[in-house]
Design a protein with these regions (language model features):
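Hydrophobic alpha-helical segments
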Residues: 1-176
Length: 176
């Protein structure tokens, strides 16, 4: 597979854009996104907040993000976030079970509620009342907002990856 348009040339980018690309290991997604340096900078700012700030449990966050990638059929996203998930404490069993999480026994009640919430956001555009109430009973309002924004952000990211047909890279090259 080859991307639908050429990746941006980092040597022609602003210093700020080059710095952000370097911090993100010049991953193909970021090289493509850097065609629009203003959007790229803001995308990375929000992505950084999602991944390193807030109170949402990182395991719940990464399960939801990886599940979003699965549902959006974005292999790049799935591969990257399974590795990120492993780095925050997701087990191999959990990563392997995500495609059919409903039948798996390796998720906590909170994780299952978050995965149901994720599925319905992606598939139905919004969760049903029952699903919303189930996750709202488990999370603080801040963590609930963070979960929804994480899913929404990674729907956008998955669609970006697939629209431009971003080339897969060895995960060890793009995720620490």
């Amino acid at each position: 597979m080859m991307a639908r348009i050429d990746y941006a040339d980092p040597s022609k980018a602003s210093e700020r854009t080059r710095d952000i690309l370097a911090k993100n290991r010049n991953a193909n997604i970021f090289r493509m996104m850097s065609h629009s340096s203003d959007y790229f900078v803001q995308y990375c700012r929000l992505g950084g907040a999602i991944r390193s700030r807030g109170e949402l449990d990182p395991i719940v966050r990464e399960l939801a993000i990886t599940r979003t990638g699965i549902l959006c059929e974005a292999p790049y996203e799935v591969i990257a976030h399974k590795r990120i998930g492993k780095n925050v404490g997701i087990t191999d069993e959990q990563n392997e079970a995500l495609a059919n999480w409903q039948a798996a026994k390796c998720f906590t009640e909170t994780q299952r509620a978050a995965l149901a919430f994720t599925d319905e956001i992606v598939k139905l555009n919004k969760p049903t009342d029952a699903t919303f109430k189930a996750i709202a009973a488990k999370l603080t309002p801040a963590a609930l907002v963070e979960l929804q924004l994480s899913v929404g952000f990674y729907i956008m990211t998955s669609k970006f990856l697939e629209t431009f047909e971003i080339d897969l890279q060895p995960v060890t090259e793009v995720v620490g």
